[in-house]
Amino acid sequence: MRTNNQRLSVLAIMVGFLCACGASGPAAITPEEAEATAREAYVYGFPMVMGYKTLYNYVIDTSNPEYKGPFNEVVCEARLFTPDDKAVVTPNADTPYCMFWLDLRAEPLVFSVPEMEPDRFYHVQLVDLYTHNFAYVGTLTTGNDAGSFLIVGPGWEGELPEGVDDVLRSETDIVFIATRTQLFGPDDLTRVAEIQQEYALQPLSAFVGGDAPPTPPAPDFPAWAEGSQFDKRFFGYLDFMMTLLGTPGPGEQPLWERLGRLGIGPDGSFDFAALPPEIQEAMKTGREEGFAEIEAFIAANSSDPLISGKVFGTREFLAETAAATYQLENADILRSVAAHRGLYGNSAAEAIYPTYLSDADGSPLDGSANQYTITFAEGQLPPVEAFWSLTMYDGKTQLFVENPLDRYLLNSTTMDDFRMEGAGALTLLIQKDEPDTHSTSNWLPAPDGPFYLVMRLYGPEAAALDGTWTPPPVEPAE
């Protein structure tokens, strides 16, 4: 027979077990542990919080200039990005976009694409909340024929419906989609608009002619405050994103348990103000260290023109790259670097982005201090299956640079307009002032200050992927 003391001991053990497994508030944690966990949380969560900024501006905040439309509605623009577009850093002006968000919690969705001209590059990029590019549809993967594709969340189980070409499975129920449709020139905008109008999205129930399932209640999306990604509010947004994730991804359970000790987790109960002052201060330090870690990784790899091909991709690709190329235990830093330099960039097989942060002498690019050139020797233009471009970005805003030509890039679709050198070489002029002695067709206007350049190779050939071909350096003009 148990004594009262024994019963109380058993009860205490049970209560302790339940608290350890199901507690929603922060557990006892030292400032040192809080600092380390906050640093880890920042590197892990930065891409998701930056993604939330885009989600909120595009889908939730109807008063935002960047607002696109509600969930599960294809939204396209037959235009190119300008300096007024500020929601996505390092934007692309080569291919008019359709950009929209899916909510798969109720049921899967079917996305259909039209037949495309054989020489036109296009693709549909599908990105989960982690910012993994989990699937593609398009020229390089499924071809230019018409097709329909079933997009499903992590909990869906079923068979491939008739009329659907493939199932594309996301780790998360919330998905971002970007379609890119090649523009051959200003006169081609009408045709691009026609193609965009043929992109179609249907709930699975409508596609098969069945009854629609109940719609789950909408999450309580917190208002986005610009700058939150760089201060204490970051942790609240990460907490919310974990409610959308619901469960940890592969290998993430230990991190989620550590975050739970700070009160950050899928129940959405995080309250930074309720934490002890010394823990708040430790988390501030950890957050700053996390951002410094991202910046340090970028700086350490600034001389690698092909780094973009290593930081965008599937979960599996990033894990392999982190281990093989950088000897890292996980790929969180790769996702964060990608989000910081250019959210929603493409996987290497679709496009790579050789990036210029410094000139051939190792000095940061600065339009107020120098004029520059990039010269492609004869036969050394970027090797691509589709096309290539070179785009200018302001070094402070990471956006396009206003200029009198409204020119933000040079690309291979205008090769006939370039002035070639006698031996067949191509020299591009990178400077803030209009050139005096050279054709303006080769001029890419720079800001009166720091800048960086991104070369985009769509459908890169093997020589570009394995380093056999390397981008020429940016040379200071003599």
Q: Residue ranges of each PLM-predicted region?
A:
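A compositional/structural signature for long, glycine/proline-rich flexible linkers
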Residues: 24-478
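Intrinsic disorder/low-complexity signature
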Residues: 1-2, 69
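C-terminal motif of bacterial Sec signal peptides marking the signal peptidase cleavage site
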Residues: 17-20
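Bacterial N-terminal signal peptides that target proteins for export
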Residues: 2-10
